[in-house]
Amino acid sequence: MAKPIVAIVGRPNVGKSTLFNRLTGGRVAIVEDQPGVTRDRLYRDANWLDREFTVVDTGGLDFGDRENPFSAIIHKQAEAAMEEADVILFLVDGRSGITADDEAVAAILRKAKKPVFLVVNKIEDFSQRERYFDFYSLGLGEPIPISASHGMNTGDLLDAVVAVLPENNGEDDDPDTIKIAVIGRPNVGKSSLVNAILGQERVIVSDIPGTTRDAIDTAFDRDGKRYILIDTAGMRRKGRIEEAVERYSVMRSLRAIDRSDVVLMVIDASQGVTEQDKKIAGYAHEAGKACVLVLNKWDLVPKDDKTMSRFDKVVRSEMSFLAYAPTIYVSALTKQRLPKILELVDFVAEQATRRISTSVLNELLADIQRVTPAPTDRGRRLKILFVTQTAVKPPTFVFFVNDEDLFHFSYRRHVENRFRETFGFEGVPMRFFIREREKEKD
């Protein structure tokens, strides 16, 4: 089920990033920092009163090209938040009071058909009611005074947010249905690829309204299997004036990734891997989803007998954090290799649900430590005492060790590589958690 999205909207310097960090506890992703992942801390998951949701920050945005009018950019930002988020936090500055930009945003948010909270930041003394009562004039209900930097009243704000979060959308979680998110930056051919895949299917069962309000999820059958394609065709930039708003497109990709079983990460082969490609792929990696790299527009690439191997090397180098993901070169236009896509989808979906018995895992673990013992650190050596698989989708393993500080990243990578060589898990990230069983005395 997709997590609800809470968007923080407001002009620059009102404290959006501070509030973002306060609401999300400043968490870091569970996954290890790995070379090659371009991380964009635009979003983080949060949990309050046992409700999970994703907070999206527009902090750090320069409201763009100063030649463009502020009002137009703010207008687009607010519209994007209205379209994509489930709950909107409109943050204003209690010290500076109401500005023309605040009024411009409020005028748009008053039309929103979803909860909007007017949050007045930088209020350290709640007895100074006049500092935030003026904001009633924005027509967005009762202002909620907070101090994001000190955490004052943010608990009450979270209580209010959780109270209006949408309930479980009742999505079909049929384990036999594979949900496929087709993601990628604008103009890489996502829509063409979706249409080409569907065009090959004899039976298109139905169009299902998705959780993103203007998206359509398409269900279809092939060879007795049910698939749902999650449409992210709306992820596109519409002009330079929306430079700031482009970051809101991440909300659609987040929704799609969150709801999916398998992610098709579409890259324009004629342009190669870009920084934006790496950011979007990083979302899927951090979400723990099975992934297939689809290099589209292969028909536009001049070729010789070594072209594909050269591309493979470049893609693996640029996206080293997705080394586990299979790659396929296709053309939505000419239909080249399109049937292979669903074969790979089936394969990585099965890999994501693999479960290895504890006894087999520990047999391999003993062999790993016998053949390649962990290096010593100040005279101490890591001992992995026991490992067990605790989850699938993604495969998750808990290691019990003598000293977690000795389980260095390089040795974790070695263990992961041996796990993959032995058990497969192709196309899926693996999660390792380390638990300290004992501290040995020297």
Swiss-Prot record:
Binding-site list for GTP 2: 184-191, 231-235, 296-299
Highest rank taxon of the organism: Bacteria
EngA-type G domain ranges (all copies): 4-169, 178-353
GO terms, biological process: ribosome biogenesis
Signal peptide segment: none
Amino acids binding GTP 1: 10-17, 57-61, 121-124
Keywords annotated in UniProt: GTP-binding, Nucleotide-binding, Repeat, Ribosome biogenesis
Molecular function in Gene Ontology: GTP binding; ribosome binding
Record-annotated disulphide pairs: none
Pfam families named in the record: KH_dom-like, MMR_HSR1
Record InterPro entries: G_ENGA (IPR031166), GTP-bd (IPR006073), GTPase_Der (IPR016484), KH_dom-like (IPR032859), KH_dom-like_a/b (IPR015946), P-loop_NTPase (IPR027417), Small_GTP-bd (IPR005225)
Stretches assigned to the KH-like domain: 354-438
Family named by the database record: Belongs to the TRAFAC class TrmE-Era-EngA-EngB-Septin-like GTPase superfamily. EngA (Der) GTPase family.
Assembly: Associates with the 50S ribosomal subunit.
Biological function: GTPase that plays an essential role in the late steps of ribosome biogenesis.
NCBIfam families documented for this protein: GTPase_EngA, small_GTP
Protein name, UniProt field: GTPase Der
